[in-house]
């Protein structure tokens, strides 16, 4: 499949925000439209997942190790502490369960939505620094976790018992900040902060298209394919961005 690589449209789009809230200009490619941007009361948000019912979002902070559930504009609804350091990803497993990615310990840790520890497993990556796994998603079709390594571009799949089932290398971006499985279309979305791009791939890692934006230090992405909505979080800006995408 020949990918469609759009040209970045340098237009300041301010989006729909609460009255009186400061906004920041955002540029996007023509197949991506900014709908809104919202300040988050979450320090260094890193990782993002849409709830199973599409009514809320899950986020983690890599500063305080807390998991947050928010509404679709980023207002905190509930939270729980994990006791973990340097959280970099979160994924919804089902309506009652989420999993987080601990970068330094190279672990996937599963919690109930109320914060009860349910299980944990090691990822087969060496080291204990902050150049490890950066993105986490759950594929309900195969019942596998999908992990992406930030620098090397390793994409690792693990089953529900945390056993590695496959390992592949991504080579199309400067780094790999986040990943999310689109179960509705059986596709993958990969976020690259340094490349300023979001990539849509088949499960066989063939690129279908890409989207460009200058959102600063993007650290998490999740999709609502039914409504053609993309949610992105920025770590240093502590902001949630809502965008509409065109994948035709």
Regions found by a protein language model. Give the residues of each.
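C-terminal motif of bacterial Sec signal peptides marking the signal peptidase cleavage site
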Residues: 17-18
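A short helix->beta-strand "capping" segment at the edge of beta-propeller domains
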Residues: 24-43
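A short beta-strand motif characteristic of beta-propeller blades
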Residues: 33-39, 75-81, 118-127, 163-170, ...
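Conserved beta-strand positions in repeat-built beta-propeller and related beta-rich domains
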Residues: 41, 51, 58-63, 99-106, ...
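Structural motif
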Residues: 66-68, 107-109, 154-157, 197-200, ...
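Short loop/turn segments that connect beta-strands within beta-propeller blades
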Residues: 71-75, 112-116, 159-163, 201-206, ...
């Amino acid at each position: 499949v020949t990918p469609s690589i759009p040209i970045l449209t340098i237009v300041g789009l301010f989006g729909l925000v609460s009255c009186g809230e400061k906004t920041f200009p955002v540029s996007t490619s023509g197949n991506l439209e900014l709908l809104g941007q919202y300040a988050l009361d979450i320090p260094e948000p890193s990782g993002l997942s849409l709830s199973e019912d599409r009514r809320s979002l899950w986020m983690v902070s890599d500063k305080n190790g807390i998991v947050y559930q928010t509404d679709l504009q980023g207002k905190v609804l509930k939270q729980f502490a994990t006791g973990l350091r340097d959280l970099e990803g979160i994924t919804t497993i089902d309506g009652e369960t989420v999993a987080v990615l601990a970068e330094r310990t190279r672990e996937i840790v599963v919690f109930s939505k109320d914060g009860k520890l349910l299980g944990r497993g090691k990822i087969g990556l060496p080291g204990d620094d902050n150049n490890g796994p950066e993105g986490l998603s759950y594929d309900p079709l195969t019942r596998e976790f999908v992990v992406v390594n930030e620098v090397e571009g390793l994409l690792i799949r693990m089953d529900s018992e945390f056993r590695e089932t496959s390992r592949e290398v991504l080579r199309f971006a400067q780094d790999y900040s986040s990943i999310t499985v689109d179960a509705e279309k059986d596709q993958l979305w990969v976020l690259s902060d340094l490349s300023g791009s979001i990539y849509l791939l088949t499960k066989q890692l063939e690129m279908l298209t890409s989207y460009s934006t200058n959102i600063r230090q993007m650290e998490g992405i999740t999709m609502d394919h039914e409504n053609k909505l993309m949610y992105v979080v920025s770590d240093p800006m502590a902001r949630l961005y809502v965008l509409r995408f065109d994948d035709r």
